[in-house]
């Protein structure tokens, strides 16, 4: 097993975690980013989306309080400086997938939201 990568977070990531409606969801979000840094969990790649922007250097992980329901929440992160030479995991945002909200916020935070251009 490799040494865990250092973690860094967007300035508003902690607020995102605190805004999750339950302590269980908050804990799950923090465990997810820890597992990503350890290399024991890997998200699905994101792509460029015409309504959102280019998130192709980011990944997403679906989660919820229980495993027997469709996950309502997403955590968006990226490996820096890139996936091949990763030296750090950056938590971008965490929140509901509803209406692409979490992806719009990720694109905004990275200065890539299409309506902001």
For the regions a language model picked out, list residue spans one by one.
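Intrinsically disordered, low-complexity, repeat-rich regions
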Residues: 3-4, 8, 41, 108-109
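A short acidic, often aromatic-flanked loop/helix-cap motif at beta-alpha or helix-coil junctions
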Residues: 14-17, 52, 99-100
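Arg/Lys-rich, positively charged N-terminal/basic patches that mediate binding to nucleic acids
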Residues: 1-35, 115-117
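A short, surface-exposed loop/turn module that caps and links secondary-structure elements
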Residues: 37-67
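Enriched for short, Lys/Arg-rich terminal
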Residues: 63-117
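A residue-level signal for beta-strand positions that form part of recognition/binding surfaces
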Residues: 4-6, 58, 88
């Amino acid at each position: 097993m490799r040494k865990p990568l250092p973690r860094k977070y967007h300035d508003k990531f902690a607020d995102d975690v605190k805004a999750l409606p339950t302590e269980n969801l908050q804990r799950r979000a923090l465990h997810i980013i820890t597992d990503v840094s350890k290399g024991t969990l890997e998200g699905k790649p994101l792509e460029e989306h015409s309504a959102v922007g280019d998130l192709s250097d980011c990944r997403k992980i679906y989660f919820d309080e229980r495993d027997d329901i469709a996950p309502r929440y997403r955590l968006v992160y990226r490996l820096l400086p890139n996936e091949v030479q990763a030296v750090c995991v950056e938590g971008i945002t965490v929140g509901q997938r509803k209406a692409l909200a979490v992806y719009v916020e990720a694109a905004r935070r990275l200065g890539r939201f299409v309506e902001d251009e």
